[in-house]
């Protein structure tokens, strides 16, 4: 503790799990936006990541509410927001946004995209997996050209609807923080926009990591055309995100309100490691320099011509550093906004516990859970191009059966 703070400000109300929550939703939004680049904007270079991006978005979306539920004293009461909704509460209304994004956007798009494959996979096969896939077809076994065209059209329409839905899913988090007028660290009109672009950065970085790791685990060569395009998109998104954050910082510095003294003291003492070192230096500047040097951004072959193996290693390190930087961003927003007193004359401290519902182990378990969910989804719905490529020949044989039935 430093300076003068009120007695009820010594302990922080929002802890580590609340910082984990916007990090997870950001990954969901970023992964879905990347999928939309392939589906809606016909960016063929990133097509190999399309289905993987959808499954990753679903895996992280399933785990996203868990930090908030674990943070609540009575998580079973969370259903009250659906039974007795308060339309004037941004937090309550987000429950409906989450349900819309999960059931109407992600699940429907995945179903339309995989319906043909589910029908073919379930025919002539036995076992639990085949039974689950047969149930997932919902009885829609028509493989005619008309039905497949409808699947593609419906999937594209849902993706278009999903883009603003993804913005709303994560932008609302920045909206909640940015609308707190009494907190000078949070109150900013740029907060929702900064959250959105940082979500794009984290989502693209995650997909770059997943794409390379899954390729190596399957003993497949990494498609460098796709990896280079992902790195280029990551570079551009990172530039915009960093520019917006610097614009927000410059505006606060220029306004020099009465809170500037305590905020400067907080930056120099409490947030040196998480903001200056992790977020800005390792999480932003180092990745920007690395991507500018080796990725086809400034020049077609990069400023420094490097072999593919070294480029893959640099992309992997950049992806890891960006994840650390974006999580530090969420930490600095959530925790940093509670470290100074409302009197603007003192600072408190936040000590993370190892055990407990708001501890490091709980947060680590929640952060690892989406990978387990993604593994199960990949086993059920293989997203690899070679799995999809085998479908037409089998589907051609199965089509008369569907018409005869």
Role assignments for model-derived ranges:
Residues 1-40, 340, 375, 391-405:
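N-terminal signal-anchor module of multipass membrane proteins
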